[in-house]
Amino acid sequence: MALPAIHNWEPYEDSLIRIKHSCFAMHELYRERYLLARTRMMYYDVPIIVLSSVSSVFIAGGDAYMSKSMVQILTCIMSLCVGIIGSLKKFFRVDENREQCLETYKDLFRMFCELAIVMDMPSTSRPGDPQQYSTETSSKYAEIMQRSLVLEGQRTKYNPIYDDHNPLPPEKKKSILSRTRSTKLSSGEITPV
């Protein structure tokens, strides 16, 4: 009776570990971004709540204390402010961005946990075909990152997914970065020093 063939995970371990570390690093960044976005919601929601409440009070009983035209002017101005704040919130897609960060954070954390469980097992007891698992995992990671928001900042440049055995030669990297900088200069995104 022949024993089942043991799959060789070694060729796939490096890329799977990089994806695992990237999931961890990026889930932390998206978590921070989500918490920041949730805090920023306060700057939109609190003024809307306060102005709407004060406006309702003025409409209900403000004419007992001031002229009707003054009450109308004040409620009109407050309603205008509520509308402007609500429009800015919608324009900047505050709710959508917050939800997208939360979804990406959860997806990356879930993927990190799945990878950690599989990669911490001895290679002889890992389930399934390593090539298929690696392909599915890479596709899933790429899909999550394509759906995600683009984050800004220095920390995003140090994503472990970029730490491979075949890095870009320094001159090629410099060429790409200088083209990116010249494009930003010509579009007015940054100013030369």
Swiss-Prot record:
It comes from the Viruses. Residues 177-193 have a biased composition (Polar residues). Residues 158-193 are annotated as: Disordered. Residues 162-174 have a biased composition (Basic and acidic residues). This is Uncharacterized protein VP11. It comes from Micromonas pusilla reovirus (isolate Netherlands/2005) (MpRV).
